[in-house]
Regions:
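Active-site-adjacent pocket scaffolds in enzyme catalytic domains
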Residues: 110, 117-211
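Short, hinge-like loop/turn segments at secondary-structure boundaries
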Residues: 25-27, 68-70, 93-96, 131-134, ...
Length: 211
């Protein structure tokens, strides 16, 4: 049986990230207490992960990001202020993402090569963002090949591919940007069941997670 290679990632954000950014300072941050617990668990099982970090927290808690980095985990971008890219202007998107890259690179001293959109919010309505990302990162992990009331591009590839500039759900090997879709499980030969993400991990039966 071929060896199964799993890619683990963490969206580094807090419980209030879905609220308006202007109100974030009104809430208690929990990432300072919970992150060491997660790092200890990863260390126990010798697991390395990619942390998609909201830039706000890197700016506020740079030492915490350095601790993640020192444990051998990759630091990637999850925007600066956890914006929904479908509901934000092009100017604000470019400003927010550029700020996230700058903050993360200043904190880590390393080039950021990965990005994941909050709410998996890249779809046909704003696929131009991939062209913007090509100038900054090597891979994206925002296109969730599922049908959901909240997000998703159900006809997008389930496997790693290179998004074409003509059609973002088609593979073009000549493109350098790599798309790493969040994990799905194909059922009934016609439906992609979302598996990646904390909600699905908690809600789905164990046999689906295990497979």
């Amino acid at each position: 049986m071929p060896k199964i290679i799993n890619i683990l990632s963490v969206d580094f954000e807090d419980y209030f990230c879905d609220l308006p950014f202007a109100k974030w300072n009104e809430y208690e941050n929990r990432v300072v207490e919970t992150t060491p617990v997660l790092l200890e668990l990863f260390s126990k099982y010798n697991v390395k992960s990619t942390f998609f970090v909201v830039g706000y927290f890197a700016e506020k808690f740079p030492k915490l990001i350095n601790e993640i980095q020192e444990e051998g985990h990759e630091i990637a971008s999850h925007s600066f202020s956890h914006i929904d890219l479908r509901k934000t202007s092009k100017t604000e998107i470019e400003k927010d993402l550029t700020k996230s890259f700058d903050v993360l690179e200043n904190v880590t001293g390393e080039k950021v090569i990965g990005f994941r959109a909050p709410f998996f919010s890249i779809d046909a309505s704003n696929s131009w963002i991939l062209s913007f990302l090509r100038k900054y990162v090597k891979y994206d992990s925002s296109i969730f090949p599922v049908k959901s009331p909240l997000y998703g591009v159900p006809n997008a590839p389930r496997q790693i591919y290179h998004p074409s500039q003509k059609n973002f759900i088609e593979n073009d090997e000549s493109e350098e940007l790599v798309e790493i879709p969040p994990l799905t499980n194909r059922i009934f030969s016609c439906y992609n069941l979302p598996v990646a993400g904390g909600f699905y991990f908690r809600a789905l039966p164990y046999f689906l997670i295990a497979n």
